[in-house]
Structures are given as C-alpha cells and as structure tokens.
Amino acid sequence: ERVLPGADRMYPDTDSAPIPLDDNYLNNLNKNLPTDVIDNYKILKEWGVNEEVYTYIFSKNLFPIITKIVDKIGVNPKYVCAFFGHEVKFAVGHYQGPEQFNFERIFKLFKYLKSKGITFELAEKMLPELIMHPQMDFESILTSMNFKKYSKKEILSKLPLLNEKFSEGKEIISNIKRKNWVMGKLRNIAIGNIELTDLSKEV
C-alpha cells in the first residue's frame, strides 16, 4: 500500500511500509552467524581437547569444519582437533601446493575414508598428496601410496610367523621388545585397515 507524504510517514525515502521478516528467516540467519569464540572455547574444554591446539584452530577458523566432521561423520572430537592441531598444521607448513590449501577437503577426506571402511589413521599419510595435488581424487592418492585393503583376520594371521622369527636365537625374550618389533613389521599394512590401538591389544 502506498504511504502518502506527511507526519505519519515512517520512512521518508520509501513509498511503501516495511515488510515484517518471517521468524524462520531470522532463525536461519542466526544459524549462519559465527558462534561466539567463548562458546567454542567452552566446547573444546568439554571435549577434553589439549589447549596447545586452540590457537591454531581459532586462528584458521577451523571450529566450523571440526564440528561438521564430528556431527556429520561421527568422528571423535578430541581426535579431530588433535589431527588439525598437529598433523594438518605440520603438513601445511612443510608441503607446498599450487594454491592455498582448502581445509574443507579434510571434511571430504574423512567422509570418503568412512564410506570405504578405511580407518582415519591413514588420513595423516594422505595429507602431503592432498596439499601438493589438490585436484587429485582420493582414490588416486591411495593408488599412488600403494595402499591395499586387508581384513583384520589377514593381518592377525601374520602374527605366529613374526613371533617365531623374533624369537629365533634368543634365550630370553622381552615381551615389550617383541611387541614393538611385531608392531613395526605390521604397521604399514595395518594403517587404514585396523586401528593401531586394537592391533596392539592383539599383539
């Protein structure tokens, strides 16, 4: 409705009355606003995240991506924060790509690994290629790394022979040394196929 000039005219520079905003529209706007840093800090504390990674997370505005990985993929938040604060920080600082690294690719990487039944520990080994060759797809990165899928049963089937090999010529066998040696031999085929903590319990 056209508003006539006069004392009752609220907006002199317009001819129409203001249109009230829908509540849903306002709520959607609020969802897109950045959460207060103090609130994010409290969430990191609740997750039990080591404070040494806070600065990197906030300086690179990684909190939204971290919560996305936690909420949509179901990865342990403490692990995700440590991954960004240590592994990603190191890789970005040591490997040079043709363009600035897009941290959103980490979300896509975790999503891909979960869809393929590959443990997230392999993500660390994939980071250099991810940074240096941003256009390379994840399947190609795995191929370049010579990654092969092994079942837990296949990996554990190698234990008897490795234990026998370690024990050869030894009168006294240190269980700690044996375990470390076997873990070292199995590490390359285990990463991505079985959690190393789970493998350690079996060894």
Task: Annotate each language-model stretch with its function.
Residues 1-203:
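Charged, compositionally biased, marginally structured helical/coil segments
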